[in-house]
Amino acid sequence: NARLRYYIGEYEWSLAVLNILKSSTSKLIANDAMTLSLLISDNLEYDTIALQRLSKADYYIYQQRYSLANQMLDSINMYNPNEVSMPYLLSRKAQIAMNDKDYELADSLYRRIYEGYSDSYIADKALLDNAILLERYLDRKEDAMECYAKLIDEFTASVYVAQARNAYRRLREIEN
């Protein structure tokens, strides 16, 4: 319901529902709610045009209309570039690249997020997604281990630390 309200541009309503979901018992649901809530609240204050385009791009992604989503994301980058929405925009472009099996592009987009926007609320997720990409799709286990280690060391409060720690141990055991 919150995401639907976000898609149709009812941001205040969406925020109200997301604030309830943030107290969810599931860490991942609460984290997803927090991510969307931060995206909306940050952009409501800064740039509502970019927020409208981001929500439209997200809706296209939901519909699996990736070409239209990419066009919408490119229009934000061209006409409304801002530091607030850029990490989220890059994560959406990486998601599309993954779907298109353009793994090298996805790798570079994830890197741009956690290297250029390390203070972003999605930098930890970008590190995790990149580690999984490197491990499973590009067969670069050493690079994946570095991403997992960076996530463990630099994002100690992340909900993804346990997953990263388990993956790191598994890869280290395979290596030895």
Language model: regions and residue ranges:
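Acidic, polar-rich low-complexity tracts and alpha-helical solenoid repeat scaffolds
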Residues: N1-N176
